[in-house]
From Swiss-Prot:
Quaternary structure note: The complex comprises the extracytoplasmic solute receptor protein DctP, and the two transmembrane proteins DctQ and DctM.
Gene behind this protein: dctQ
Pfam families: DctQ
Cytoplasmic domain ranges by topology: 1-7, 89-112, 171-227
Full protein name: C4-dicarboxylate TRAP transporter small permease protein DctQ
Intervals, Periplasmic compartment: 29-67, 134-149
Molecular functions per Gene Ontology: transmembrane transporter activity
Length: 227
C-alpha cells in the first residue's frame, strides 16, 4: 500500500513539473515569436517587400489571436501543488536541509530523543496546517469564488494545502516510526543519481541496503550478533 502511495506521489509531482515546464516553454516561445514576426513586418515594409510584409502580418495576426494569458495563472497553481506535495516527498526521502551540529554532539539516547521530538513537532505543525487548510477550503467552497483567468473554483486551487499538509504529516509520522524501530533516517545523497553507479554502494556485508543519515550515526543502530 505504501509503495502505491509513494509511486502516486512521484507520478503526481513529475506530471506537475512536466506540465508547468511545457506551459512556460510554449508561453515564452509564443511571446518572443510574436515580437520577431512584428519586427519582420516592419523590415519588409521598410524595404518595399509588400508580399513578404503581408505574409508576415498574416502570421502576426494568427499568433496574436492565440490567447495564452491563462498560462501564467495555471503555472502558479501547478507550482503551489508541486511545492506542497514536493515537501512531503522531501520528508520521505530526506531531501530537506537539517542543521545537525548540536544534535551530533549529544550522546546516543539524547540524540534519539531530540530527533523524535523534531519529527513529532513537524507532524504536529503540518497536522495543524492541514486542519486549518481544510476549514479554509470549506469556506472558499461556500464563497463560490473563482480564479481571474481560468475561472477555476478557488476551493479547488487551495485544496493543495490540506492535501499536501496531510501527506506531509503522515510522512513525518512514517519517518518517526521507522527511526524509532530501526534507528535510521532516510538520507538523500545530492551527488547520487538513481540508477547510476549504484553497484556495491550503501550495501553492508550481509547485502542489506544502508540508509544512514548524518543524524543517525552507526552507534545508534545495533546489529544483531551471530550466535
Amino acid at each position: 500500500m505504501l509503495r502505491i502511495l509513494d509511486r502516486a506521489e512521484e507520478v503526481l509531482i513529475a506530471a506537475l513539473i512536466a506540465t508547468a515546464t511545457v506551459l512556460i516553454f510554449v508561453s515564452v516561445t509564443h511571446r518572443f515569436t510574436l515580437g520577431f514576426v512584428a519586427d519582420f513586418v516592419g523590415f519588409f515594409r521598410g524595404h518595399g517587400m509588400t508580399g513578404a510584409a503581408a505574409a508576415a502580418k498574416s502570421l502576426y495576426t494568427t499568433l496574436r489571436g492565440i490567447n495564452l494569458v491563462w498560462a501564467q495563472e495555471l503555472c502558479i497553481i501547478l507550482f503551489v501543488w508541486m511545492a506542497k506535495f514536493g515537501a512531503a516527498y522531501g520528508v520521505r526521502t530526506g531531501i530537506h536541509v537539517g542543521i545537525d551540529v548540536l544534535i551530533n554532539r549529544l550522546d546516543a539516547p539524547k540524540r534519539r530523543f531530540f530527533i523524535l521530538l523534531g519529527l513529532g513537532a513537524g507532524a504536529l505543525f503540518t497536522g495543524i496546517i492541514a486542519t486549518l487548510g481544510a476549514n479554509f477550503v470549506l469556506h472558499m467552497y461556500h464563497a463560490s469564488s473563482t480564479s481571474p483567468d481560468l475561472e477555476l473554483p478557488m476551493w479547488l486551487v487551495y485544496l493543495a494545502i490540506p492535501m499536501g499538509s496531510s501527506l506531509m504529516c503522515f510522512r513525518f509520522l512514517q519517518v518517526a516510526f521507522g527511526f524509532a524501530r530501526t534507528g535510521e533516517l532516510p538520507h538523500h545523497d545530492h551527488g547520487h543519481v538513481d540508477g547510476v553507479d549504484t553497484e556495491n554502494e550503501g550495501i553492508d556485508a550481509e547485502g542489506d541496503v544502508l540508509l544512514h543519515s548524518p543524524l543517525t550515526p552507526r552507534d545508534l543502530v545495533e546489529k544483531p550478533k551471530d550466535n
